[in-house]
Structures are given as structure tokens and as C-alpha cells.
């Protein structure tokens, strides 16, 4: 933990990124821009959203809107209710993977199911946490939602392996 703190604080850009997580308004035009715009986008959505395709943030205000900040766009276009549904879907995926890992017939299946589920859940947690401003912005895509070919292919392949392990369970 101490080494991670030292590495974070020695590189200037890492320090600025971490400090802007706590107070994005200290540098609103540079390191805090993405966090502020993500918050604005989510607040614009309200309870039911602005309508599918009606987001304003994705047209230049929020950088990497289709990849790193897709959760903010979902919240803006479809609202708080849809954002909660996305979180609920990830919880269901996590419970399915945990159940599969616990019921897998052999050790390999258990480890595969646990590893794939942990990977998908941590990636979702880090992305949503960064968009909400409770974690530093890291550039981790939101599994199964973010735009990007390699991430989508790897996630779908891993989920296919998880489904195969689930199929083998009694």
C-alpha cells in the first residue's frame, strides 16, 4: 500500500488525477473536466432521461463518452432508473457467476467461473465508480456496454466460457 502511494505521488499526472478525484473543481478545465461533465450529464438525465439518442454530453462535452463514460451517457439518455437497471444487471451477472463457481463440478471450472466473474465485476465497479466520482478515472471500459472491439470480444469470449462451465454443472 505504501509503495502504491509513493508511485502515485511521485508522478505528477498521477497525483493530479488522484487529487482531482477528491475535488474536480480545483482544476475544472484540465484534470477535473471529465468528472464534472460526467456529473452534468447524469444530472441532466433526471429520473427518466432525455430520450434515447438525445444526449448532449456525447457531442464533445464529455471526452471518451462512448467508451470510458458510457454509464454517464446511459444515465443522461435513459435516466436514473435505467442506470440502476444497469447496476442490477451486473449484480445478476455476479450472482450467476458466483453460483456457477460454487456449483462447478471440478476445480478448473470453479477457478474459471470465479476468475471471469471477478474480472467482469471489478471492471464494472471501477468504471461505474470512476463515472460517479468515487474512484479515480482510469479508462477501464464498462463490460458489454462500452464501444471497443477488443474489450467486447474478450468479454464475450470469457462470458461464453462461464456459460459453458454453468452448462456442465449438475
Which residues fall in each region the model found?
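Transmembrane helix-bundle signature of multi-pass membrane transporters/permeases
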Residues: 61, 73-76, 116-120, 148-151
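Alpha-helical transmembrane segments of multi-pass membrane proteins
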Residues: 4-7, 116-126, 160
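Hydrophobic/aromatic residues in alpha-helical transmembrane segments
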Residues: 14, 90-97, 117, 130, ...
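Hydrophobic, glycine- and aromatic-enriched re-entrant/interface helices and adjoining loop segments
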Residues: 1-85, 105-109
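Hydrophobic transmembrane alpha-helices and their immediate junctions
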Residues: 80-124
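Generic alpha-helical transmembrane segments of integral inner-membrane proteins
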Residues: 1-5, 84-92, 156, 160
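A juxtamembrane structural motif centered on a specific transmembrane helix
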Residues: 125-170
Amino acid at each position: 500500500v505504501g509503495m502504491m502511494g509513493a508511485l502515485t505521488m511521485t508522478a505528477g499526472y498521477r497525483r493530479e488525477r488522484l487529487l482531482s478525484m477528491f475535488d474536480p473543481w480545483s482544476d475544472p478545465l484540465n484534470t477535473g473536466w471529465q468528472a464534472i461533465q460526467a456529473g452534468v450529464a447524469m444530472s441532466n438525465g433526471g429520473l427518466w432521461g432525455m430520450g434515447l439518442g438525445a444526449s448532449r454530453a456525447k457531442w464533445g462535452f464529455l471526452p471518451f463518452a462512448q467508451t470510458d463514460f458510457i454509464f454517464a451517457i446511459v444515465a443522461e439518455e435513459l435516466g436514473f432508473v435505467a442506470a440502476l437497471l444497469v447496476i442490477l444487471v451486473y449484480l445478476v451477472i455476479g450472482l450467476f457467476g458466483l453460483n456457477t463457481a460454487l456449483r462447478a463440478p471440478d476445480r478448473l471450472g470453479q477457478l474459471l467461473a470465479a476468475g471471469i466473474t471477478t474480472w467482469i465485476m471489478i471492471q464494472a465497479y471501477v468504471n461505474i465508480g470512476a463515472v460517479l466520482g468515487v474512484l479515480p478515472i482510469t479508462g477501464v471500459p464498462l463490460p458489454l456496454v462500452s464501444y471497443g472491439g477488443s474489450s467486447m470480444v474478450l468479454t464475450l469470449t470469457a462470458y461464453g466460457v462461464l456459460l459453458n462451465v454453468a452448462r456442465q454443472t449438475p
